[in-house]
Amino acid sequence: MTASETIVCKPTPWFLFRALAIVVMFGVFAVLFYRDGATGYRKKNGIFYLNKTFQRAGGDFSKMNASGTLTAAEWRKFAATQAVDFPEDSSVLPANTHLPVPWPAILQDYERMKPLQPNILWREYTKERGVNSGPPEEPYSAQAIREQWIVCGICTLLVLVAGFFLIRTVRRSISADGEAITTQTGKRIAFADLKTLDLRKWETKGLAFIDYEDKLGKGKIRIDGLTYGGFKKENDEPAERLMRKIRSCFSGEIIEYATFRASESSGGESKPS
């Protein structure tokens, strides 16, 4: 490595994969919560109340035919005046549900109701319409539906934040030449302005911190070798090469090889060996 050589460390595949995984994860969560808030819970409520109506219809038929004298005309007349037991709050029901909703035709059919098997009729009804025959144990409240929208909004915000940092990091790099170090923010700082190089976390976490003071004031540089450059030997360990370059040009105080408490050194990602 010559004195004039420039070492450039770009974002590592390790970081990009993790960041992209976070974006995808929260994106999937946002879609799932959106689906439940927009249609999922409301459709399940529709199934719940329809199923309850089938059970009630079976009970009504049994009571009216207790003496065995109920006629088909009497049942059709009664069933035609009945409505599905939907709540008045349309916000918890499937979109375009116009109340009142009359009983399905299958419940108005005397011959099909006569065996008093509402569960079988329910399965036939749902099979004909290609919907899930298993209703939820309890209906979802308006509050539960609002919560899906809230969590969807939170996940969407996290996607935007994570995506912002991912895009920003992809465009960044850390580099060092014979005169200065250029940080990931694009600030160029001469080696002569570097005061302290803290390497206590370099061996365990791939982190180093440099204090500097130039004409604009004091500051700190954070070098994350796992994010920029990496330590893969097949790539000639770009982060290590960058650090060797910095150390070869550094004339300030170096702090290194401190012993960490077990609880401190065990957490987080470790620098690859």
Descriptions of predicted regions:
Residues 16-27, 153, 157-161, 167:
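Alpha-helical hydrophobic membrane-insertion segments
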Residues 1-142:
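N-terminal membrane-targeting/pre-transmembrane regions
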Residues 142-156:
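N-terminal membrane-entry
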Residues 151-155, 167-173, 217-222:
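Long, charged, alpha-helical interaction scaffolds
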Residues 188-228:
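Acidic, Ser/Thr-rich low-complexity segments on the non-lumenal side of membrane proteins
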Residues 218-273:
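A membrane-cytosol interface segment of integral membrane proteins
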Residues 158-198:
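Conserved beta-hairpin
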